Amino acid sequence: MKVRSFIMRLKDTGLTAQELKDMVNKYMVETYERYDFIAERAEGMYLYDEEGNAYLDFYGGVAVNSCGNRNPKVIAAIKDQLDDIMHTFNYPYTIPQALLAKKICDTIGMDKIFYQNSGTEANECMIKMARKYGVEKYGPEHYHIVTAINGFHGRTYGALSATGQPDNACQLGFKPMLPGFSYAEYNNLEDFKSKVTDNTIAIMIEPVQGEGGVHPATQEFMKGLREFCDENDMLLLIDEVQTGWCRTGAVMSYMNYGIKPDIVSMAKGLGG
């Protein structure tokens, strides 16, 4: 007999659709303007509500479910892992951790990886690594980073400070932001150069901006940033949280430009 540990269908809760929505509104902090349907299950490219209506899932878990909803191979891999270890800590060696690290490094041509829990944490780590590099090599004032206007790097404090949307609701109410960031116009190499100071240690960029549309970087811009960073001993940090893992034709989006970052962040599609 198949036993469910958690109730998964609305009919099993004894609630109406409106009662469930009211429960969410009562007990959860309202940070999103929700669509007016209940996503009860998913399959492939579709979400289904409690009445069986299908919705084409353009979000993909917001760039997470690259293999589709409930992909059989992904589900099988998760179940196999749960039969061995569900979660452990970093002190023991584990087989999947080692194999995945080698696979990622071999695939994207990097030397090492550092595991995090989310995309915003990966971006926080990039910022910390760049600052550490600048401070240790050049002194305590060398921590300045230039990022793009209308970019998005996450909602934790450092990543939010790197997000070039100072007048957006995502920053309002949380100021002052972490110091050491300047914002330049996307796809404008000269504007980026103008924001660089004697204390700038890195440029942080998304290959495709996803805020307010889909805005890819030009070949000239990305190659120009790489050359400019090389000439001035600055790090090029590329945020591939949304664009990474085959979402733009290449394994990583920066590969479309024939360049290589000093540090790259990834998440979302890496998990599914």
Region roles according to the model:
Residues 3-272:
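Conserved N-terminal phosphate-binding loop of PLP-dependent enzymes in the Aspartate aminotransferase
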